[in-house]
């Protein structure tokens, strides 16, 4: 997926709910399509609406960050996309054109709590292979697990157990599991939020490389504005109660991006300020 660095650095535009999704013929196909999505939860005070009138499309090979204040429903929206939370009446959610009815084929959720998502009694390669078991042959499982570990730089740690790996390496195992399943949709919930600064930047660049080489569609929840601008093609900002998408910001920075050079660009700083203003305006 290429980005035209000659375009303006900070542009925005919501696709109207009535506008047809793009479907090939030189345009990016829509992997995930949401219209009028709402979510209600039970609380001590009765039913409470968390999300309302969410309209969004995730396009083939796109990396989209979802931001907003704590409690605005960012994780809830990801869980809707992977079929773990049922949206309210009138909601339309499709993945690859198919209405969502449970976890969709080809979608993988990457959690912030990497330690809890890996099985400590399984080796790294067997953790990566977990989602493939019973679906493909043993030979294909081995090939796909090996290829995924190679892609995230962990081929030499295939026989290790997760508890022997650093936090950053464990998070790479989660990413490899998604790659092994040939995921068309990676749903990442603050995957680097619990890591130290150096490991975090390293994994940001690892994700950028994997995204460039394999082109999965990625929806990425983060509270880190710099991270969102650095990684994303677009940033969606949730605000309000119940939350809606209050802003959509296109990130037209050249790729591949560099932790120092990119973040020194005037365009990066303009985007950073714009995202900050969009979030803090939700009072």
Task: Name each region found by the language model.
Residues 122-133:
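Q-loop/switch helix immediately C-terminal to the Walker
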Residues 180-184:
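A short, proline-enriched helix->beta-strand linker immediately N-terminal to the Walker B motif
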Residues 136-157, 209:
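Conserved ABC ATPase "signature" region
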Residues 21-34, 39-53:
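A short, flexible loop at the N-terminus of ABC-type nucleotide-binding domains that lies
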Residues 161-165, 169:
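Conserved ABC ATPase signature
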Residues 82:
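Helix-to-loop junction immediately C-terminal to a conserved catalytic motif
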């Amino acid at each position: 997926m290429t980005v035209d660095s000659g375009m303006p650095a900070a542009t925005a535009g919501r696709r109207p709910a009535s506008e047809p999704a793009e479907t090939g013929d030189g345009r990016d196909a829509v992997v995930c399509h949401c219209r009028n999505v709402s979510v209600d939860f039970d609380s001590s005070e009765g039913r409470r609406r968390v999300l309302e009138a969410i309209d969004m499309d995730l396009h083939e090979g796109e990396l989209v960050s979802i931001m907003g204040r704590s409690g605005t429903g960012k994780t809830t929206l990801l869980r809707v996309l992977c079929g773990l939370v049922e949206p309210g009446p009138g909601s339309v959610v499709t993945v690859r054109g198919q209405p969502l009815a449970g976890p969709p084929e080809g979608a993988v959720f990457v959690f912030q709590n990497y330690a809890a998502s890996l099985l400590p009694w399984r080796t790294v390669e067997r953790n990566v292979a977990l989602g493939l078991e019973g679906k493909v042959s043993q030979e294909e499982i081995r090939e796909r697990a090996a290829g995924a570990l190679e892609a995230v730089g962990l081929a030499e740690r295939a026989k290790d157990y997760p508890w022997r790996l650093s936090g950053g390496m464990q998070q790479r195992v989660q990413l490899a599991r998604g790659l092994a399943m040939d995921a068309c949709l990676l749903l990442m919930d603050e995957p680097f939020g619990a890591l130290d600064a150096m490991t975090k930047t390293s994994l940001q660049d690892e994700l950028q490389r994997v995204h460039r080489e394999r082109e999965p569609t990625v929806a990425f929840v983060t509270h880190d504005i710099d991270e969102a601008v650095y990684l994303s093609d677009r940033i969606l900002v949730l605000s309000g109660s119940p939350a809606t998408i209050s802003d959509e910001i296109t990130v037209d920075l050249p790729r591949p991006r560099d932790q120092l050079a990119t973040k020194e660009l005037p365009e990066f700083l303009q985007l950073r300020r714009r995202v900050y203003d969009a979030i803090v305006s939700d009072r």
